[in-house]
Each structure stands twice: as structure tokens, then as C-alpha cells.
């Protein structure tokens, strides 16, 4: 095991604080509507230009081990805030830097770091309670668009696109962001349930222009095994033919004579059918088949449930208003399932989301909820160059997270004003001793910092603006984009409550850990061994006269 360097007390803390400041100073220039850009070097291709705090934080790695420890701890604040709320990373970094900077002064003067931390925690709890009180629900399209626009660095077109997408697919619907092919942003909406499996034979196509198979008012047969023998299918095919309606077969696979017979019947116009493979694999496939069954009001024909293909009846088949099957996707529109059953299924999947341990599982379960509850919207981001496309796409994703957070916990006045208003809950707060009181003061001072930074980035005098905003009430604040004092909620300058709350909580948590650090252990820099000496030059005696 390599030897380690152990550094104690102020020496350790001072170096770590240097790291905190390096990272925070690079991140905080991006805050607010007049935030500056940061250019990130790429090992290949052109550099990336961004105003996204977490993207800047992720790039920073410092040479000095102790400085790097401090920087990594604040990086954790940014990424945790991004994971939980999707936005507010720069605000969280600014808050963490302020709490660390103020706290270090008190620690250096001999105060007890543990009591300081208790005071900080007490103040943060009171501030969060106050934020919840002043929060208002975010319900209208206009409010959703405002949140999206602010999060996307005051780009109202992005806010409008997100509000439109949420309106189309509902609050629970899946909204994904992709690269567009034009200069304008576009919105594609897929209503109903879509899964990534297409027709098993191109002979099923009945709309040559769109290269899709369209089934109107079809039955849906769901089976969890392979179908290769047509005799298994005949009884149910005869019943469907009598009913005079088309049929969609979703099974693990349809092959051999079963597929050939379906194709021949389709070409001759005897029975309109389409066969597709079931989506997913393993247990996920079973779950998705069950989802489709509930959505269409049918049953999965599986041996586990005591049902067989030969004995299947029309009562066990699902139904839908319309189904479109393309080469790679199948879309079920307006399934005949009962709303109460669909709701119960959504609730069940949501419980699984809460219990999921991996991000991948959580993402897949959320997709299932969306497919059951609403639909899928795709925002295609348009830009002139690839560099602009990457930057804009990152902003759209941020804005999307922020709007979801706003719908979840409501909104507060933006521009750092909500934190100024939440200070009223702390102003009269008292700790158990003088050191805890100092901890409360640290948070009071830190909660001004986001507003100060927004104003500084806008090129104005921060102290004047902070004093003017603090003297006001409610949503009265400073709009840095226009340089005016207005009612920020009316002006559309709003932040999701969840973002502000998460930023404050995470900043206080990591800053508290830094303040209570008394030793740091890191690897000693490796000393490269000197290179081995070369061979002696020349070969004596060669070419000499004897």
C-alpha cells in the first residue's frame, strides 16, 4: 500500500477551501439571465461553450490533492442538486461557497465547528419551512412556460415548447429531447402507448405511402410464448374473422407456418392481421405485456394464468380504437381498458419506482408509467452548428427537469428573492449557545449570496440591490434581465420551490462537513524512478591496426 500524507487542522481546511473557491468561482459566473459563458476544452473536436453550472463543475479536476478534495465535495453539491431537482446547480454552489467562507472565519476564531453546524442545520430547517409556506402551486400552461424559460437562460421559445409538450401528454407523460434536423425547435407527439417493436413481415403493410400497417377498431391478442403452429391460432382467428374486425398479435415471436398463413390471409384480404414481437426481455417483457393487456382491456394468454391459445375467446382479447404498426414502432391509440384498472396499474408501477435501486430500472419504470398514463412527446432541438446544438440541448434538458419540479412542489419568486424572503423565518431564531447563533448568522448571510451574484454578473452594484429587495415584501424583487424592480411572479421570473429547497439543503450539508473536517488523508505524489543508464558508447578495439 502506497504511503499517505496526513494533514491536520487549519492546514487541511485552508487548502480544501482554496479548491472550493476555484470550482465555485468558475461555476458562479454562469448564474442569472446575464450570466457569462464558460468554454470547456474537448480532447477531440471543437470546445464546448456552456452556461450550465453542473457541466462546468463536472469538468474541474485540480492537481493539488487537498484542493481537489474540496472541489470534489462542492461538485457533489452541484450533481446531487441536479439529480434531485434537475436545476439549481449554480445556486447550490454559490450557497455552499458562502457557508464555507463565512464558517471558516468563525472556526479560525476558535468557535466549536460542531455547534456551528448545529446552528446552520437549525437555520436551514426553518428556511425550508418558510419556502414551503410562500410557495404557490404551478398549474397553468403560462406558469409552466415561465419556469421553463427561466431555467433555459431566459429563452421563452424553449419554455413554450415544454409547456406545449406537457399540455399534450399530461404531467406524467414522457418528454424526451433529441437533435433536430432544422434550425427551428420542433415538437412531435405520440398519443397512446408506443413500444419499440415493428411488424414481422413487410407484407402486413396496408398504407404504402407511410410504410405502416393501420388497423381500425382491432382486437389485440397477447401471448407470452412463440407461435409457430397455425393450428394453435385457428380457433381465435375464426372468431375474429366472424366478427369482421382486424387483429394485432403480440407474442414472443411468430414464425414458420403461422407467420406464412397470416401473411397469405392478409394479402388475399380474408383477414386483416399484423404480428409483432412483444417489447422488452425477461421479466420486463411480462410486465409490459400485462400493461398492454390492462390498457386494451384484454388478458395475457399464458400458461401461468391457465389460459391457452387453442381455447382463447374474444372476451380474452384486448381492443383499441386504432393501432399503427411501423417498421420499428407500434402505437396503440385509445385502448379499451377501464380507467380504474389503468389507474391502479400506474399506482403499482409508481410504488416500484420508489423502491427501485438502480437509475436504469427507475427510468424504465417511469417510461411504463408515462405510456400507461399519457403519451410520449419528443422535443427536437434545432440549431445552426453542432456546438450550439449541444449547448441548447443541455439547456432544454435542464428546463424540462425544472418544470417537472415546479409541477411537483410549486413555484416561488425567482432571482434569489425567495431566499431573501425566507430569511424572515431565521431572523428571530436563537441557538442553544453563542456558537450556534453564529451558525444561524452564517446561513442568513449565505441566503443573500445568489441575489448578489446575479446582480454582479449583470454588472450592477450588489449591496444596493440587496438592500432594496430586502426592504420590499412578497414577490417584489430585481429583474436582472431588464434592470427593473418589479413583482417577479407577474414578470414570469420564477423558480421551482423544489430547486431552491434542494440547493439550500445540499449546500448546507456539504459545507457543514467541510467545516467539521479536522484531518485529511491523501496519497503522496509519486516520485518517478530515474531512468536506467544507457550502454557505454562505442566498442573499443574496433578498426584498430594490429
From Swiss-Prot:
Annotated GO CC locations? cytoplasm
Q: Which residues bind ATP?
A: 30-33, 51, 87-91, 415, 479-481, 495
* E.C. number(s) listed in UniProt: 5.6.1.7
Q: Which reaction does it catalyse?
A: ATP + H2O + a folded polypeptide = ADP + phosphate + an unfolded polypeptide
Molecular function GO terms recorded: ATP binding; ATP-dependent protein folding chaperone; isomerase activity; unfolded protein binding
Is Cytoplasm set as a keyword in this record? yes
Q: What is its main location?
A: cytoplasm
Q: Name one GO biological process term.
A: protein refolding
Transmembrane stretches in the record are none
InterPro entries in UniProt: Chaperonin_Cpn60_CS (IPR018370), Cpn60/GroEL (IPR001844), Cpn60/GroEL/TCP-1 (IPR002423), GroEL-like_apical_dom_sf (IPR027409), GROEL-like_equatorial_sf (IPR027413), TCP-1-like_intermed_sf (IPR027410)
For this UniProt record, the keywords arranged alphabetically read as follows: ATP-binding, Chaperone, Cytoplasm, Isomerase, Nucleotide-binding
Task: Keyword check for Chloroplast, yes or no.
Answer: no
The UniProt entry, under SUPFAM superfamilies, shows: GroEL apical domain-like (SSF52029), GroEL equatorial domain-like (SSF48592), GroEL-intermediate domain like (SSF54849)
Q: Where in the cell?
A: Cytoplasm
Protein's job:
Together with its co-chaperonin GroES, plays an essential role in assisting protein folding. The GroEL-GroES system forms a nano-cage that allows encapsulation of the non-native substrate proteins and provides a physical environment optimized to promote and accelerate protein folding.
Q: Name the HAMAP family for this protein.
A: CH60
Family, according to the entry, reads as follows:
Belongs to the chaperonin (HSP60) family.
Please give the subunit comment from the record: Forms a cylinder of 14 subunits composed of two heptameric rings stacked back-to-back. Interacts with the co-chaperonin GroES.
**PANTHER family xrefs:** 60 KDA HEAT SHOCK PROTEIN, MITOCHONDRIAL
Q: What is this protein called?
A: Chaperonin GroEL
Q: Which organism is it from?
A: Paraburkholderia phytofirmans (strain DSM 17436 / LMG 22146 / PsJN) (Burkholderia phytofirmans)
Amino acid at each position: 500500500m502506497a504511503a499517505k500524507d496526513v494533514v491536520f487542522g487549519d492546514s487541511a481546511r485552508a487548502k480544501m477551501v482554496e479548491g472550493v473557491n476555484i470550482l465555485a468561482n468558475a461555476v458562479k459566473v454562469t448564474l442569472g439571465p446575464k450570466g457569462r459563458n464558460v468554454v470547456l476544452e474537448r480532447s477531440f473536436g471543437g470546445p464546448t461553450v456552456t452556461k450550465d453550472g453542473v457541466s462546468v463543475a463536472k469538468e474541474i479536476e485540480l492537481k493539488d490533492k487537498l484542493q481537489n478534495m474540496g472541489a470534489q465535495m462542492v461538485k457533489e453539491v452541484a450533481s446531487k442538486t441536479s439529480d434531485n431537482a434537475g436545476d439549481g446547480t449554480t445556486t447550490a454552489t454559490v450557497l455552499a461557497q458562502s457557508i464555507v467562507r463565512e464558517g471558516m472565519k468563525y472556526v479560525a476564531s476558535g468557535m466549536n465547528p460542531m455547534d456551528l453546524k448545529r446552528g446552520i442545520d437549525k437555520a436551514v430547517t426553518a428556511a425550508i419551512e418558510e419556502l414551503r409556506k410562500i410557495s404557490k402551486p404551478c398549474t397553468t400552461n403560462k406558469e409552466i412556460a415561465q419556469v421553463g424559460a427561466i431555467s433555459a437562460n431566459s429563452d421563452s421559445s424553449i419554455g413554450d415548447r415544454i409547456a406545449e409538450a406537457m399540455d399534450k401528454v399530461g404531467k406524467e407523460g414522457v418528454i424526451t429531447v433529441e437533435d433536430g434536423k432544422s434550425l427551428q425547435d420542433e415538437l412531435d407527439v405520440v398519443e397512446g402507448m408506443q413500444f419499440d417493436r415493428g411488424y414481422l413481415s413487410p407484407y402486413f403493410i396496408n398504407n404504402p405511402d407511410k410504410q405502416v400497417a393501420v388497423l381500425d377498431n382491432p382486437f389485440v391478442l397477447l401471448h407470452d410464448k412463440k407461435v409457430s403452429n397455425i393450428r394453435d391460432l385457428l380457433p381465435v382467428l375464426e372468431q375474429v374473422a366472424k366478427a369482421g374486425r382486424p387483429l394485432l398479435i403480440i407474442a414472443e415471436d411468430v414464425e414458420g407456418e403461422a407467420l406464412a398463413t397470416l401473411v397469405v390471409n392478409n394479402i388475399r384480404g380474408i383477414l386483416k392481421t399484423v404480428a409483432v414481437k412483444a417489447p422488452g426481455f425477461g421479466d420486463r417483457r411480462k410486465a409490459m405485456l400485462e400493461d398492454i393487456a390492462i390498457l386494451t382491456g384484454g388478458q395475457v394468454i399464458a400458461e401461468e394464468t391457465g389460459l391457452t391459445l387453442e381455447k382463447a375467446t374474444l372476451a380474452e382479447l384486448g381492443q383499441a380504437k386504432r393501432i399503427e404498426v411501423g417498421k420499428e414502432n407500434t402505437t396503440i391509440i385509445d385502448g379499451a381498458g377501464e380507467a380504474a384498472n389503468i389507474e391502479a396499474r400506474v399506482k403499482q408501477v409508481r410504488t416500484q419506482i420508489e423502491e427501485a435501486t438502480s437509475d436504469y430500472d427507475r427510468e424504465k419504470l417511469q417510461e411504463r408509467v408515462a405510456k400507461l398514463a399519457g403519451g410520449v412527446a419528443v422535443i427536437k432541438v434545432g440549431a445552426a452548428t453542432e456546438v450550439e446544438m449541444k449547448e441548447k440541448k443541455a439547456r432544454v434538458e435542464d428546463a424540462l427537469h425544472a418544470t417537472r419540479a415546479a409541477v411537483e412542489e410549486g413555484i416561488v419568486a425567482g432571482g434569489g428573492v425567495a431566499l431573501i424572503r425566507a430569511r424572515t423565518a431565521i431572523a428571530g431564531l436563537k441557538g442553544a449557545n453563542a456558537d450556534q447563533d453564529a451558525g444561524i448568522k452564517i446561513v442568513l448571510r449565505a441566503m443573500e449570496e445568489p441575489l448578489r451574484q446575479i446582480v454582479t454578473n449583470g454588472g450592477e452594484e450588489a449591496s444596493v440591490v440587496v438592500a432594496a429587495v430586502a426592504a420590499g415584501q412578497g414577490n417584489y424583487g430585481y429583474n436582472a434581465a431588464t434592470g427593473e424592480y418589479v413583482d417577479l411572479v407577474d414578470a414570469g421570473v420564477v423558480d421551482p420551490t423544489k430547486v431552491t429547497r434542494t440547493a439550500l439543503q445540499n449546500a448546507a450539508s456539504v459545507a457543514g462537513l467541510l467545516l467539521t473536517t479536522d484531518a485529511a488523508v491523501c496519497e503522496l505524489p509519486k516520485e518517478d524512478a530515474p531512468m536506467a543508464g544507457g550502454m557505454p558508447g562505442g566498442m573499443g578495439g574496433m578498426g584498430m591496426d594490429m
